[in-house]
Amino acid sequence: MFLLKIKKERMKRMDFSLTREQEMLKKLARQFAEIELEPVAEEIDREHVFPAENFKKMAEIGLTGIGIPKEFGGSGGGTLEKVIAVSEFGKKCMASASILSIHLIAPQAIYKYGTKEQKETYLPRLTKGGELGAFALTEPNAGSDAGAVKTTAILDSQTNEYVLNGTKCFISGGGRAGVLVIFALTEPKKGLKGMSAIIVEKGTPGFSIGKVESKMGIAGSETAELIFEDCRVPAANLLGKEGKGFKIAMEALDGARIGVGAQAIGIAEGAIDLSVKYVHERIQFGKPIANLQGIQWYIADMATKTAAARALVEFAAYLEDAGKPFTKESAMCKLNASENARFVTNLALQIHGGYGYMKDYPLERMYRDAKITEIYEGTSEIHKVVIAREVMKR
C-alpha cells in the first residue's frame, strides 16, 4: 500500500493535461488565430503593417491581460496560459505571436513591482484598455551587455521629476506602445547598481520615436528607436526601488524567454501542419510523397524535436507559475525551441520544394520569421553562457 500511494502521488504530479479553463483558452486562441490572424498574415508581412485592429480584438477577449488579476482588468492565469495563447498565434502569424508575447512583459513587471497607484493607473489600460506595452532595455552599444546602458534618468529634486536622456534601439512595439518600462541609470557612477526602471507614457514631452526598422521577419511587429531628450516624468513613475532596475530587467527577461519559446514551438507546429497536409496532396511518381521514407523521416524528426521543445517550454512555465527558480530552464527552453524552429521551418520549406520558396505560400515567411527567436530576448550564445553558469554553480 505504501508503494502504491507513492505511485499515485507521482502520477498526480506528472499529469500534463490542461485544465478545463486552459482547454477553453486554447480553443479561443486557436479560433482567433484562424479567423482573425491567418487571413491577414501575408498582408501584414508584405506591407509591414502593425495589426492595430487585431490587437484591440485581443484585448476585447482578454488575451492582453493574461497573468494579471481581474481586479486590474486582467484575465488571471499565469505563464502556462501565456504559452498556450502565444503558441497558437505562432502557428498562423508569428508577428502577432511576438506582439502579444512582448506586450505582456510590461503589465507583468508593473504588477510584480508596481505600487498600488501604478497598478490602478496602468494595468487596466494595458489589459482591457487595449493599449500596447513595451519593454525598453536595448541600446546601440548595449545589447547582450546590459551593463553598457548609457541612458540616464537624473532626479530633479526641485520638481520631483526624473529627467531622461538617451536612446533605445530595437524596441518591439516601441513606436506604438502607450505605456513603456524604460531602464536608465539614476546613478550613472554606480553602473548596473545604479540602473532603475521607470514608467514612461506615450506623448510625454521630450520622448520621441526615431527610426522604425525594416526587418527580415515578423514585419508586423514594429521595431523602433526611442529618443529621450530632457524627458521629464514624475518620480512616482519609478518602478520598484532605485538601483533595482537590472534585477527587474533580468527577472522580466527570464519570463520573456519562455514567451519566445512559445513563439518558436508555435511556428514549428504550424510548419509541421502545413508539411503534413502538403505531403498527402503532392503526387510524384504516381503516388503521394508521404509514401517516401525520406519524407517520413523528415516528418518524424520535426515532430519529435518539436514535442520535446514544447515539453521544456511548458516545464519552465510550470516552474515560474510555482514560484520556483527557473532561470536555467527559461534559458534552456528558449535556446532549444528557437533552434528547433529554424530546423523545422528549414525542413518544411525543403519538403515543399519550389513552392515553399515562393511568396504565394507561407513557408518562406515562416522561415524568415523563425530566425528572430534565436536573437531577441538574448541570443543563443548568451543563453549557453547562462545555462553553463547555472549548471556549474556550487
Curated annotation (Swiss-Prot):
Thermal dependence of function as given in the entry: In the range between 25 and 55 degrees Celsius, the activity increases with rising temperature. Above 55 degrees Celsius, it decreases and becomes almost zero at 65 degrees Celsius.
Enzyme class, broadest EC rank: oxidoreductase
Gene Ontology, cellular component aspect: cytoplasm
Signal sequence range: none
Pfam families: Acyl-CoA_dh_1, Acyl-CoA_dh_M, Acyl-CoA_dh_N
Subunit structure: Heterohexadecamer; tetramer of tetramers. Each tetramer is composed of 2 alpha (AcrC), a beta (AcrA) and a gamma (AcrB) subunit.
Record-stated family: Belongs to the acyl-CoA dehydrogenase family.
Role played: Probable catalytic subunit of the acryloyl-CoA reductase complex involved in the pathway of L-alanine fermentation. Catalyzes the irreversible NADH-dependent formation of propionyl-CoA from acryloyl-CoA. It can also use 3-buten-2-one as substrate.
Name of the protein this chain belongs to: Acryloyl-CoA reductase (NADH)
Species annotation: Anaerotignum propionicum (Clostridium propionicum)
Lineage of the species this protein comes from: Bacteria, Bacillati, Bacillota, Clostridia, Lachnospirales
Name of the gene this protein is made from: acrC
